[in-house]
Regions:
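Active-site-adjacent structural elements that line small-molecule/cofactor binding pockets in enzymes
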Residues: 1-287
Length: 287
């Protein structure tokens, strides 16, 4: 992002979703303020709590009360970036200065003066309570595996969002006149998240797909994937689901299906494609 920021002057710089267990809120704030300074105020920081398999298995941290931990993390991040005074915080998950230890910790604040006192935060979330937390505390929400036709499942979560709240949906886009071939690629992605990106007893991606009306298929996908039958798991992803979660097919078809996204609460598309021509095509349609 620092390199992209140095080569551009207008576009915003988004991080996608940084797992909050990977960085303390003070460390994340220092990095964000530096990037925002170098880009003259163009950073949008995406954050997310991840899941227990990653948090406990990779970062070696406990995973209790993720909503409360996220709330505390955001509060500290905001205070550091605001740079109004040395930061003191006494929470359940974070304490600044640390209680105990050598007893030498003291409240501190940034040396660098931010170009903005508030850097936009976008919360990656799938659970209804987590989405509601994002609508309360953040400038935006980054959903994935969401259908523009079924976003009413978040009606209550988004009921009190501010008028300028951003919803930046992650959408795979594949321009291909062979629709079945395009959807097969989407099915592999969706099937991997439903089947493998979480434990059998705790998988927020599977839960989200189930809440959108594909519970029976989600159960089958997870069962096949965990049995080592990945190809069968991917094939078990319904065409309807893969199609709704993506933009696939000819340019004319994609152009038609873009209308559903435009009519939904989504305000921005995070386009997933390695193809520059596809990005250019979508820019012409959306901008």
């Amino acid at each position: 992002l620092a390199w992209i920021g140095s080569q551009t002057s207008k576009i915003n710089l988004g991080t996608s979703i940084m797992q909050i267990s990977a960085r303390t809120p003070t460390s994340a704030a220092m990095t964000a303020v530096t990037l925002d300074y170098l880009s003259n105020g163009r950073l949008k920081l995406g954050i997310g709590v991840s899941g227990p398999q990653v948090v406990e298995g990779w970062y070696g941290q406990p995973y209790p009360k993720p909503l409360a931990r996220t709330r505390e993390w955001i509060e500290i991040f905001r205070r550091v970036v605001a740079r109004e005074e040395p930061v003191e915080f006494d929470g359940e998950h974070y304490q600044l200065p640390l209680q105990g230890g050598m007893g030498l910790g003291k409240p501190l604040k940034l040396i660098l003066h931010p170009v903005r006192s508030r850097i936009p935060l976008y919360l990656g979330a799938e659970g209804p309570k987590n989405v509601a937390l994002g609508a309360e505390l953040c400038e935006g929400w980054i959903p994935m595996l969401i259908s523009p036709y079924r976003m009413d499942i978040y009606k209550d979560s988004l009921a009190h969002r501010p008028p300028d709240f951003d919803i930046a949906a992650t959408v795979t886009v594949i321009v291909d006149d062979d629709l079945d071939r395009a959807l097969a690629r989407v099915k592999a992605f969706v099937g991997f998240y439903i089947g493998g990106m979480g434990a059998k007893s705790f998988n927020v991606h599977k839960d989200l797909v189930s809440r959108q009306g594909f519970g029976e298929a989600a159960d089958k996908i997870q069962e096949l994937f965990m049995a080592g039958r990945r190809d069968e798991a991917f094939a078990a992803v319904p065409d309807e689901l893969a199609d709704e979660l993506s933009l696939c097919g000819s340019k004319d078809r994609i152009r038609d299906r873009l209308q559903a996204w435009k009519e939904s609460p989504v305000t921005m598309l995070n386009v997933g494609t390695p193809d520059r021509d596809t990005l250019r095509f979508l820019a012409e349609e959306l901008l």
